[in-house]
Amino acid sequence: LESKIQPNIIIGVLMLLLSLFSVSAQHINTLNVRLNDENKELNIQQEFTYLNDSKKTLETLYFNDWANAYSDKNTALAKSFAEQFKRSLHLAKDDERGFTNILTVVDDDYRGITWERSSGKDIIKIFLNKPLLPNQTAKIFITYTVKLPPNKYTPYGYSNRNEYYLKDWYLTPAVFDGKWHLYSNKNLEDLHTGVTETTLNLIYPENLYMTSNYRVLGNSKFPSGQQAQLEGKRHKSCELIFTPLNTFTTHVTPHMTIRTDITATKYDAVLQALSIDRVTEFIYKNLGKYPHAQLLVSNIDYSKNPLYGLNQLPKFIRPYDERFQFEMKILKTALTNILEETLYLDPRKEQWLNDAIANYLMIAYVEEFYPDQKLLGKLSKIWGIRSFNLAKMGFNEQYPFVYLGLARKNLDQPLITPNDSLIVANQKVGNKYKAGLGLSYLASYIGKGKVDESIKTFYQYYQLNRVRVLDFESILKRSADQDIDWFFNNYVYSDRIIDYKIKKVKKTEDSLKITLKNKEGTVVPISMFGLSNDSIVSKYWFSNIEKERTVTIPRNNEERLVLNYDQKIPEFNQRDNWKSLGGFLSGNKKLKFTFLQDSENPYFNQIFYTPVLEFNIYDGWTPGMRLHNKTLLKRPFEIDVSPSYSFREKAFVGSGSLSYLKYLSKTGLYFANYRVSGGTRHFNVNSRYSTFTPSIRFGWRPENLISNKRQFLSFRYVNIFRDLDENLPDLRNDSENPDYSVFNVRYAKVDNNILNYSSLLLDFQQASKFTKISAEYEYRKLFDNNRQFNLRLYAGKFLRNKTNSDFFSFALDRPTDYLFDYGYLGRSEDSGLYSQQLIIAEGGFKSFLDERYRFSNDWILTANSSVNLWRWIELYGDIGLVKNRGLKQKLVYDSGVRLNLVTDYFELYLPLYSNNGWEISQPSYGEKIRFIVTVDIKTLTGLFTRKWF
């Protein structure tokens, strides 16, 4: 034990001395700032003394100018917003932007200094007049104004209630440690700056209250405003909040002073103070003393990193007690700000460590003070909900649950992935939870006390100094009695899946011989529990299992063996984690029917049932029951059937599918989906169609998961069976051969970008009577002047055509949909409202032209385009050539107004001029209007979730 502790003491003393000696090793920054309330500007005079603490001579310096990230459409911030389908900054007017206007840059001899901006426009490169030697300083004077943006893009800027939130608003030095670390503002809260001592002299309007994370040395009023002096020693950027009302309160606790505007309306103010005392006591016990004068814990900071989940529901259905919710909000925001303010990690590349410590301590807080807290809170006690497996989950079970939700979709990323390379879901939730869960997993393996002490040691020794993840790693390894290389190599630095199973169990009188299988080859420790009457009677850890390993344990009246019973390990699949020792029949999983949907229960075969109601004009309203096995976590094998009843046809209809999804890798060829689907509905009065389609689909994606580029290749064999009402007129098909089959190959390449969208679709179809190929290209461009241009090109050609009708022909304005792919509300209608439904496919025309040219049995070539006039009002135009066998090709065209309310989801097309002449002046104009509408719930859901994934 002595040999273990002694090195830690020595290293601790050395680090303490290092921190004492490095107090003076920092930059010096003095700011004189005036807030101009009328112009929403900051007038700044900055005196910066840059210390070259490297071993290299510097001829240039770099400063972060993140306030300039709002200056135009081409900044790194604007491009990041576009990747998330946000175009508010792109569409902003000039007076709605924020920027930095640098007036002068001079040295201490008052000589002008040359400077330039980076390509991202939020980093400034300063060319020194003379080289800066190691351990020497250079003084720079900068005069500039900062135009603040409205806070509709991010919380930064001003609100329409005359409130201001300023963070990362002035020039700060970039970090140089032998190389420059230059990071643009991408709204990731990860400014990387050097250790600085800052003095701020501030003048602001008399009608505002000011709050800051800096220490306020003095505040006084004068006839036209207020003046304050603030100080930040070894601080990062100064955060300022101005409000017309004083909404912040100060809580002086034994361990730190907190300024906060987070409140709970139904929780007494005295009790709130006691809760803050409890939170700060917990933080002090686990981290140690906070080194700054006060900690700012604001609602704005909380909103940037909230408690995701049910607490975001409207207040009238909040499921948690006010005390619990208040403490968790204070705890999460305080931990986030403490670690951000005091640990000088590289926040873009090493953010996972801050996330790990914060979320690990949040898990520990709930375990200590709220061990019985359920994930659904009070909702878990309500009849009709309490029977769900989700209602039985503890609050801390959300961490593996959320992480696995992303891992099951093949979207998890290594913890060391830079912030700006994470998809939004991982950046906001997934990787944060995985990081905290990882430390909790490690604590369960090596002992909670050792992880707790390592965190506290790391924080105390390295606060307010430059630090790396490797420093934390070395402290952990010295504390552990076991080898923990696996934690960093196979958990932190990897996205490999953890998945074990109990392969078999052999019983003897006094022992159990158990064979464990590592299904994915990720070598990490696995826990095994012995249960009797749902009570734990034994627990073991097994490590270094590369493929399979047989272990022997003593019998201790176990009835069941369960791997990872406490779910400390984020294991991919827990459905095969248990073995019953009671015989063959006792090991069979029972079937469990559950309403709607639920979390995964590994001890049952789950079937979910949900009432469904669909509509088309032939079946009318069709109520039914959907039966499926899709849990809240995605599963590889899914079954989904929806039998329904058509009241109009007085017959059963419905659909069903069997699907197996195999993820092959993270990038490149990343999935293969094998599927069999079928369905039956009516497509006219007393006329039914049935489909049976086996298919396989492959997907490709680039190494950059943030990219919206995807490629797909699918093969399917569509079999159509039709029963026709002989009393109805010809439905544009060969009534003597109502059944047909089509072999279809499709290749798609998509770049789903809000500024530059493009897609390419190649299609090949082979049937007994025809062979055809087609190509479709679509492009959308949002220009810098906010003008949007849309272009779609389509070309199709029959290689062989022995049909005697237009049922399989290329359509100019309304495809027949013989493969039953499209969501027509009335697919056989030739007149009436339902016939006006528009689906942009094949020719893509909007006007109904002469019947002779509405279909092509030879070849077709069309172009569809539109350009916006104002917001969602656009002009569209279509032109094309239609060629039928035995006839000359025909030039066709139309034009009109497009009301692009929600692209691809709800649009209206008002025709103006076409081959028919001026349609707007012709009778029955209302019958010529076309519309796009999406009523499918799954498709609509994609509109709101696309930015996350």
List the predicted regions and their residue ranges:
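C-terminal outer-membrane beta-barrel translocator/porin domains of Gram-negative envelope proteins
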Residues: 675-686, 742-867, 949
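Outer-membrane beta-barrel "beta-signal"
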Residues: 899, 903-904, 926-949
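Outer-membrane beta-barrel initiation region
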Residues: 534, 542-543, 551-555, 564-669, ...
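Beta-strand-rich binding/interaction modules
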Residues: 211-212, 294-295, 451, 484-485, ...
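Juxtacatalytic substrate-recognition/specificity segment
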Residues: 200, 248-353, 357-369, 423, ...
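Acidic/His/Gly-enriched intrinsically disordered linker/tail segments
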Residues: 355-437
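Extended, low-hydrophobicity, Ser/Thr/Pro/Gly-biased non-transmembrane segments
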Residues: 85-104, 110, 116-117, 122, ...
